[in-house]
A protein has these predicted regions:
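P-loop NTPase "switch/coupling" elements that transmit nucleotide state to mechanical/effector output
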Residues: 1-21, 31-148
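Conserved lysine of the Walker
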Residues: 26
Length: 148
């Protein structure tokens, strides 16, 4: 994980993807569930990445200025959902959105860009963790035959 984050400071993109069947521990492993009250050993990957990002910002702040923006995208049944957009918390809001459309596009140079996604400027790990908690509370969850 640290090498991926360090690569971002050098201008590279990085992605960590959790994929698996229902109940396999993706949310727990990534740490996008509520982390309040969990021990240091039990927090997931995302809170650890947040902590490391801000450690690196602190170590490098004499050489560069940093602006960190946070967004939270959910892809559910091939539909894109902005989890930081206010008023996006109910299933009805998602079925009949009154907001701008989110799209993912490949640019001419091959980079992938997301348009229409809310970005929140954060100045600390605590602010970024608050975005994570806020967005996590808006994720779509539903039972499947695996839960039965």
């Amino acid at each position: 994980m640290k090498n991926l984050v360090l690569g971002c400071f050098e201008g590279f993109n990085a992605t960590i993807l959790a994929y698996g069947q229902t109940g396999s521990g993706k949310t727990f492993t990534m740490g996008s569930g509520y982390t309040i009250g969990l021990s240091r050993e039990d927090i997931g990957l995302i809170p650890r990445v947040i902590e490391f990002i801000f450690q690196e910002v602190e170590a490098r702040k004499q050489k560069a200025e940093f602006i960190i923006k946070c967004s939270f995208l959910e892809i559910y049944n091939e539909e894109l959902h902005d989890l930081l957009e206010e008023g996006n918390s109910t299933m009805m809001d998602r079925i009949m959105p009154a907001k701008k459309e989110i799209s993912i596009r490949e640019e001419k140079n091959g980079t992938i860009s997301v348009y229409g996604l809310k970005e929140v400027t954060v100045k600390s790990g605590e602010e970024m963790a608050a975005c994570l908690d806020s967005g996590s509370s808006q994720r779509i969850t539903s039972s499947t035959m695996m839960n039965a």
